[in-house]
UniProtKB/Swiss-Prot annotation:
Pfam families named among the record's database cross-references: Ldh_1_C, Ldh_1_N
The protein's name in its UniProt record: L-lactate dehydrogenase B chain
Effect of L45P: In strain: Isolate Georgia 2B
Top EC category: oxidoreductase
Active site: H194
Gene that this polypeptide is encoded by: ldhb
Sites where the protein binds NAD(+): 30-58, 100, 139
Length: 334
């Protein structure tokens, strides 16, 4: 006796369906991971979304919650499992998993614990999606992007850190608020480390091509009477402030990751400040990952824009690199 399905559907194709072309995997279903996942879904950036985590109940719950809303989205398939086989054929893998810093813990110890976590994650990603691009979001992101590159064996252009894409967005928002314009109307970049030693490029800050440094040669310096430098300090402090108020940050980084995802899966060749291998650039001699203006396309980081920086800005960038290398050089088991 024929089933309802057999009566309803007459198959025409003899072969099974093609594998997904724009499959995105998010590793880690915490606050940041789910903000990334939802942002990617809302922008219709994948034809399949896979979620992976070690916490099976939370993972299944998040998967079901998203699946129940698929009617309202254009992505047809959301899957999840602790087994990385579910990630097979991913075009992009977003890594948000990692351990949190404990009170009084050194950054080196935090990174070393995350190295041990990543040693379980990265080889599994490569096993099932050898042609993927990896976007690292876990903090400290620049060092963990280096760790991912070393563990994955992928070429450097296919291992990217979310870097200062969010720092730059915060900078543009805060500067634009002070100027009374929309964030998209202010052009400004924050480079270097995602964190305390990030570098605001005051020499390039402009509105409609009008250089703010030409209007105020002291902008961003201690001698600036208008104290624009305080805006960058607010950028650096902003994550700490949000964490103090709500316990974590997730929405802005989720939007930022979706923005980067779009440039990669749609092959847009847009320029973003993301973490990439900077050895031999700006006089940096070590294998560190820092944020520079990168052209993101289907191959990952297609190229790096050779931004004109002042001597002071280059010195700050080198300081950023030294800070990161100070941690990286003592890492074990890489």
């Amino acid at each position: 006796m024929s089933s309802v399905l057999q009566k309803l559907i007459t198959p025409l194709a003899s072969s099974s369906a093609e594998p997904p072309r724009n499959k995105v995997t998010v590793v880690g279903v915490g606050q940041v991971g789910m903000a990334c996942a939802v942002s990617i879904l809302l922008r219709d950036l994948c034809d399949e979304l896979a979620l992976v985590d070690v916490m099976e109940d939370r993972l299944k719950g998040e998967m079901m919650d998203l699946q129940h809303g698929l009617l309202f989205l254009k992505t047809s398939k959301v899957v999840a499992d602790k087994d990385y086989a579910v990630t097979a054929n991913s075009r992009l893998v977003v890594v948000t998993a990692g351990v949190r810093q404990q009170e009084g813990e050194s950054r080196l110890n935090l990174v070393q614990r995350n190295v041990n976590v990543f040693k379980c994650i990265i080889p599994q990603i490569i096993k099932y999606s050898p042609n993927c691009t990896i976007l690292v979001v876990s903090n400290p992101v620049d060092v963990l992007t280096y760790v991912t590159w070393k563990l994955s064996g992928l070429p450097k252009h296919r291992v990217i850190g979310s870097g200062t894409n969010l720092d730059s967005a915060r900078f543009r928002y805060m500067m634009a608020e002070r100027l009374g314009i929309h964030a998209s109307a202010f052009n400004g970049w924050v480079l270097g480390e995602h964190g305390d030693t990030s570098v605001p490029v005051w020499s390039g800050a402009n509105v409609a091509g009008v250089s703010l440094q030409k209007l105020n040669p002291e902008i961003g310096t201690d001698g600036d009477k208008e104290q624009w430098k305080a805006t960058h300090k607010a950028v650096v402090d902003s994550a700490y402030e949000v964490i103090k108020l709500k316990g974590y940050t997730n929405w802005a980084i989720g939007f930022s990751v979706a923005d980067l995802t779009e440039s990669i899966v749609k092959n847009l060749s847009r320029v973003h400040p993301v973490s990439t291998m900077v050895k031999d650039m700006f006089g940096i001699g070590e294998e560190v990952f820092l944020s520079l203006p990168c052209v993101l396309n289907g191959s990952g980081v297609g190229s790096v824009v050779n931004m004109t920086l002042t001597d002071a800005e280059v010195a700050q960038l080198k300081k950023s690199a030294d800070t990161l290398w100070g941690i990286q050089k003592d890492l074990k088991d890489l």
